[in-house]
Regions:
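Structured, non-membrane catalytic/scaffold regions adjacent to prosthetic-group chemistry
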Residues: 20-156, 269
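Axial heme c-ligation environment in periplasmic c-type cytochrome domains
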Residues: 91, 201-207, 227-256, 262, ...
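Periplasmic c-type cytochrome electron-transfer domains
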Residues: 117-167, 213, 218-220, 242-260
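Sec/Tat signal peptide C-region and signal peptidase I cleavage site
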Residues: 15-19
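Bacterial N-terminal signal peptides
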Residues: 5-13
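Gly/Gly-Pro-rich "capping" loops immediately C-terminal to redox-active cysteine motifs
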Residues: 193-226
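The canonical Cys-X-X-Cys-His
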Residues: 180-195, 221, 239, 255-259
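Electrostatic cytochrome c docking/interface patches
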Residues: 158-183
Length: 269
């Protein structure tokens, strides 16, 4: 019996160790980083993050420059940050490698010194959290602050990976649905699939069986995006509101145009 107890304790400890390991796949192999390894790097330092998106306050973290963990990744690559809960943030590598003044850092939660919970009954943002210094210079949106990160992968552009999401190829580059597809990639596909394609697991598909533009009036659709709690409310709701600082009126118009366009291009998964 004592041996069994010791083995269970050992396996439990091993499980905790695995939980605090970050897998980084640059396309040339996977590198697993433990919390201890990251905090021991010579480029790790304490950083101050004003206006932390997740904690809504100024926070200080021990962190590593994100681009230092992406050796050899070109600026035109695409990065996917997947969290433990299925949230999948899609971020152009150029924003991290050359953020034009915005600086990405991987904040690391030290063992035995947990960060505050994100809310009542919720875990912290750790063990790995992408934070930004001067995000407005990117610009960097709130969906590009993924927390509880489990994996980082270099992947092809979403338009190549998910062809059923693409608008009609006959449309010009400046057509509203084409611009709206870019908005969808920045703000929506972190939580939603479309036509059954995408990696997110949090929100409903935005075209199958119906696009929200098919069952909501235009003003109600805008309420859903700007202030979702004003349209429907339940305890497990996770959708944030997107104000004009994050999503301009033109971007919202383009997103609506894209979803209306895709309502006529349904592909059953």
């Amino acid at each position: 019996m004592r041996f069994l107890i010791v083995m269970l304790a050992y396996l439990g400890a091993m499980g905790l160790a695995r939980a605090d390991t970050l897998a980084v796949d640059t396309g040339r192999g996977v590198r697993a980083w433990t919390t201890t390894e990251l905090l021991s790097r010579p480029d790790a330092r304490d950083i101050r993050v004003p206006g932390d998106v997740s904690y809504h306050a100024t926070r200080t973290y021990r962190a590593v420059p994100m681009k230092a963990l992406l050796p050899g990744v070109p600026a035109d690559a695409h990065l996917q940050f997947t969290a433990r809960d299925g949230f999948a943030a899609e971020i152009p590598a150029s924003l991290i490698i050359d953020g034009h003044g915005a600086h990405a850092w991987l904040a690391v939660e030290p063992d035995g010194a947990a960060w505050p919970p994100l809310g009542a009954g919720k875990p912290s943002a750790g063990p790995f959290y992408l934070v930004w210094i001067d995000p407005d210079k990117g610009p960097v949106g709130p969906e590009q602050w993924p927390y509880q990160i489990a994996t980082i992968k270099v992947l092809p552009d979403p338009a190549k990976r998910f062809p059923a999401m693409r608008p009609d190829p006959r449309l010009g580059a400046d057509a509203a649905p084409v611009r709206g597809f870019a908005v969808f990639q920045r703000h929506c596909m972190t939580c939603h699939t479309l036509n059954g394609q995408g990696d997110a697991k949090l929100g409903p598909d935005l075209n199958i069986p119906h696009s929200p533009t098919e069952y909501l009036r235009a003003d109600m659709f805008r309420t859903l995006v700007r202030n979702p709690q004003n349209l429907r409310r339940w305890p497990q709701s996770k959708m944030p509101g997107f104000d004009t600082h994050v999503l301009s009126d033109r971007d919202l118009d383009d997103l609506e145009a894209y979803l209306k366009h895709m309502a006529g291009r349904k592909v059953q998964p």
